[in-house]
């Protein structure tokens, strides 16, 4: 692919998403471009016309964290796109933050899920705590798999559910440490892969009944 703008964006990206007919969301990752010392940068790219429709930063990390040599670990994240491709959610593995993004309006809402500020000092000190392993979403809700416990031997997972305004709706404590999951709302079931590679199935009817 040799279109000038698109080629440059794709070469610098870590992942891209198809939002619609020839429209891509491209993430210029901090990890892929460590020399940039920038926050997570996204571009909405029109493949047919080789044009950048809009661009935005999905985070606003302090300079101390951006320049820290161990930031590659700090910025590990999972991204999910809503069914209508208008919204995006980012859950960070070692930061107590979930970013909710309206892709069309370039509106970003950063939620601090453990305390009222970003815990970047833990990363600088070399003692990062894991917060999230995976995130899923639909047009109505965000499902984030959080980690509870002080060390791997005691880790257990907690399923946090938010709406797109960032309201914390409800949670469910699980008996295992879950690394990945999927939600089957029609059958009111969650399928999960545990940290020791076991497949589990959870009945989430009671949880779904709590949602507005």
Feature locations, PLM:
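Hydrophobic beta-strand positions that form the internal "hydrophobic ladder"
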Residues: 30-31, 88, 142, 190
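Structural signature of eukaryotic scaffold interfaces centered on beta-propeller domains
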Residues: 14-28, 71-86, 91, 127-138, ...
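Blade-level signature of beta-propeller repeat domains, shared across WD40, Kelch, NHL, RCC1
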Residues: 181-212
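Loop/turn-rich, solvent-exposed surfaces of beta-rich toroidal or solenoidal domains
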Residues: 124-162
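Short, solvent-exposed loop/turn segments at conserved positions within beta-propeller repeat blades
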Residues: 34-40, 91-94, 151-155
